[in-house]
Amino acid sequence: MFTGIIEEMGTILEVAKGTHSAVLTIAAGKVLEDVNIGDSIAVNGVCLTVTSFDGETFTADVMHETLNRSSLAQCKRKSPVNLERAMPANGRFGGHIVAGHVDATGQIAGRKQDDNAIWIRVEAPPEVLRYVVEKGSITIDGISLTVAAVTAHDFSVSMIPHTAEVTTLGSKKEGDIVNLETDIIGKYVEKLLHPQEEKKETHITQAFLEKYGF
């Protein structure tokens, strides 16, 4: 689990693409301080498992489903990425609950400066927008942000200068693709309120049970 508070920006050094997967080698610093094989690191909001590392880089596999659902398929050498280690049990919860499981990608549809605030508008698919609420939390490329406004086709967030300086979102422009993860609490609430929609049709009815002596 992560919190959406980016620890540092890393740089992709190598992208080894397979038929339906890829292996990323990423240059980093802070996130390598206590890393071990098998640890989770969020890369632009995508939870990846460390498969090897040295003092300056780490390597992680990216599976077919992740490539299809996230922007990692577009990553190239020298691309900057947001990095966050999994939250320790005694860590501070600075953002919100982030699973590192990207729901879909969105596209930056607008960006404007308002005094010291940077407003970003993101177009998102319906399956994402259904869980986006005003004043709620949204993860954009691994960054925990507060939703300022929502429409039928997009949502807006306001970014402070510090976030722009220490994350990749500061250099994003209109038309760029970003990873989106909605607040998982909303998904659980929906399932609790509508449990029948998740159940598959069954042939075991009351009449069936009575017929066989139950």
What spans do the regions from the language model cover?
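Conserved loop->alpha-helix
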Residues: 1-214
